[in-house]
A protein has these predicted regions:
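Structural marker of alpha-solenoid helical repeat scaffolds
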Residues: 435, 469, 503, 537, ...
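Polytopic membrane enzymes that build or remodel cell-surface glycoconjugates and lipids
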Residues: 2-488, 509, 513, 543
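Register position in tetratricopeptide repeats
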Residues: 452, 486, 520-521, 554-555, ...
């Protein structure tokens, strides 16, 4: 039977834990509250708004069995594998619909959960609550994490870090330093499941087995005499899961890197640029200013490059710090290994895409940095409590407390400010171009934002700037072709579309724009050919299917049009496809199917006046006058000047009054 004072002590500890967790949750949440009102930006629109995989559970097999962009068809064939990201979007869509708030809330909750796991892992590793609190608090507030939290697509790093930390914590449970751990199958199953989810978040998780092996043989205290088989049994599950994942990526998906983006870069160049990147990442961790969403990559070609020299200096400092910590405070040298191992996968510029350097790549590695800062601050604080000069020590403690508070406030303010940069696409792209004026992809994206608002002059300006030096992108060429098409400069437009196709034959936009241009020019056979090519490249593109369906209707090809609208609805249920199917069924006299089509459209869009008017026509044909009037009036709420509907209401109400 437990003694009362032990129960009281246990209750006090639980209350203290609750207070600590509440503080950490507030530190994680409060700086990001203003991000909840941000919109979809950058890749969010394609990966959420235009992605049928996100809108239906029937694509679950494709989510986990294919790469991220395969919903785009041939142009989306890559080895970029992030199934847990798409699955998270699917769950958020089912809960919140297409409200950006829900997706931002998901990121915020995940960030808070990661902060709590940082605290738990730190305490398990170093057995020091003060260090754990400082490290996790610093991690919660660090502005370098804004991209991962404020940008919805940053969820990949949040998921990776959550399951990576959880897996490491479960591994530490198997390798408990204070006692012999009871190894149950449940523990191993949880470890395998958690690590599998980490790998399904991002391949960066492959470094976890290496970290576990190093920790097991070099850092875990208390069992120096342990048998080798006792040690390897703890990390063997991680190694087996990693091997299975590598085999799956290699044989089912074709590898890890989607392409060698810089095939001309030599391996000596890879090393030089990796050193330069290390210097840049260390600089952003220590002094997180001039943050931006996109950094233009400038290749380093010489050891004398200032960025390489800065990286070498950083490596020398880290090596010296590691050697000193190994001798004086060995457990904390593991923090440097954590940073190096988790950052290593993003240091190969030869394989990295256009954005070689990105702040979000620091989300997981920064934990090691936070451990070191936590250790330094805790050591200074405790040192300021011992000595023979109380007044001086009190002053030192006050100075430490003020410094910590100042840094925390500075970080929180910088985070709040950075959240505003992600508010919407125009703000994001303008802010990014202020910092990186030669970012061609950002000029392209800003031009798209202008074009969607009908500002074609500014769109053209941005796309011309996006051409820049070197080989232009197929996207930019296609967009400029669209401008020339709208200016009726068809020959120039066709030339730009052809250039885009030669650069990227699987890119669907130039085929679609060529089809639309040929329609304007009256070259209907050529238009039909381009439409057919486009839908073969992007079979799940509902907008393309619907556009092609309308074209076929105008040519009197109702049967072919029906097929396009049906495939559109099948790919991703949408009101436009069902509206057109309803019109076709109504014209064919199939009133039952027409009614089902219009009702399906209204289920997807309750203010779809086209469906309301279609149902009204059906009711009128079937003599259900009161229902017809009600449907016409429902449609008039969103289309109050529709002459046909107004006349129908007047006519039908006149009939009922008679």
């Amino acid at each position: 039977m437990a003694k009362p004072w032990l129960n009281g002590e246990h209750r006090q500890n639980r209350e203290n834990d609750a207070i600590v967790f509440l503080i950490l949750i507030l530190l994680a949440f409060l700086p990001y509250v203003n991000a909840l009102s941000n919109t979809f930006v950058y890749d969010d629109r394609q990966q959420i708004l235009e992605n049928p995989y996100v809108h239906s559970f029937r694509y679950l097999g494709r989510i986990f069995g294919s790469t991220v962009w395969t919903f785009e068809g041939a142009q989306g064939i890559t080895n970029y594998y992030r199934p847990l990201m798409t699955f998270a979007y699917l769950l958020a869509y089912k809960i919140f619909g297409l409200l950006p708030f829900g997706f931002h809330l998901m990121n915020l909750v995940l960030h808070a959960a990661v902060v709590l796991l940082v605290f738990a892992v730190t305490e398990r590793l170093f057995h020091d609550r003060l260090i754990s609190l400082i490290a996790s608090g610093l991690f919660a507030l660090h502005p370098i994490h804004t991209e991962s939290v404020a940008w919805i697509a940053g969820v990949t790093d949040l998921e990776l870090s959550f399951f990576f930390l959880l897996s490491f914590l479960l591994y530490l449970h198997l390798a408990d330093t204070g006692r012999k751990t009871t190894r149950s199958w449940t523990s191993y199953i949880l470890l395998v499941l958690s690590y599998s989810l980490s790998l399904l978040s991002k391949e960066q998780a492959l470094v976890l087995p290496a970290l576990a092996i190093v920790y097991e043989h070099l850092y875990r205290p208390g069992e120096a005499g342990s048998q080798f088989h006792d040690k390897w049994r703890r990390y063997l599950p991680l190694c087996l899961v990693a091997a299975a994942y590598i085999a799956f990526r290699r044989f089912a998906l074709g590898g890890f890197a989607p392409a060698i983006w810089r095939p001309t870069m030599s391996w000596s160049g890879v090393v030089l640029n990796a050193i330069a990147l290390i210097g840049s990442y260390l600089g952003k961790l220590v002094w997180p200013v001039h943050l931006t969403a996109f950094y233009v990559f400038h290749e380093s070609r010489s050891v004398a490059d200032p960025r390489v020299l800065a990286g070498l200096a950083g490596l020398i400092v880290c090596a010296g710090l590691f050697a000193w910590l190994w001798r004086t405070a060995r457990p904390f040298s593991f923090a440097l290994l954590w940073m190096g191992a988790t950052l290593a996968p993003v240091l190969n510029a030869r394989w990295m895409p256009a954005q070689v350097f990105a702040e979000r790549y620091l989300y997981l590695p920064s934990i090691g940095f936070c451990w070191l800062i936590g250790w330094v601050v805790a050591k200074l604080w405790r040192g300021a409590r011992e000595g023979s000069r109380p007044a001086a020590l009190a002053f030192l403690r006050q100075a430490i407390a003020i410094t910590v508070a100042f840094v925390a406030c500075f970080y929180a303010i910088r985070t709040v400010e950075r959240n505003r940069d992600w508010r919407d696409e125009e703000v994001l792209y303008r802010k990014t171009l202020e910092a990186q004026p030669d970012a061609q992809v950002i000029h392209t994206n800003l031009g798209v934002d202008y074009s969607e608002r009908g500002d074609w002059a500014n769109a053209e300006r941005e796309w011309i700037l996006a051409l820049g030096p070197g080989t232009p992108s197929a996207v930019t060429l296609s967009n400029l072709g669209l401008v020339r098409m709208k200016q009726k400069r068809y020959s120039e437009a066709a030339d730009l579309f052809d250039q885009a196709i030669r650069l990227r034959p699987s890119f669907v936009d130039p085929y679609k724009h060529l089809a639309e241009m040929y329609v304007e020019m009256g070259r209907l056979v050529d238009a039909d050919n381009q439409f057919q090519h486009a839908v073969s490249l992007a079979p799940l593109d509902i907008n393309l299917r619907n556009t092609y369906g309308h074209f076929l209707l105008q040519q009197g090809r109702a049967s072919d049009a029906r097929e396009q609208f049906a495939r559109s609805a099948e790919a991703d249920a949408n009101a436009e496809a069902y509206d057109n199917l309803g019109d076709l069924d109504l014209a064919a006299g199939d009133t039952q199917r027409a009614r089902a089509d219009y009702q399906a459209a209204l289920a997807l869009n309750e203010i779809d006046n086209h469906a309301d008017f279609g149902l009204a026509k059906l009711d009128e044909q079937q003599g259900r006058i009161a229902d017809a009037v009600r449907e016409y009036r429902a449609g008039l709420e969103t289309d109050p000047r529709n002459a046909v509907a107004l006349a129908a209401v007047q006519r039908l109400t006149g009939q009922t009054s008679q």
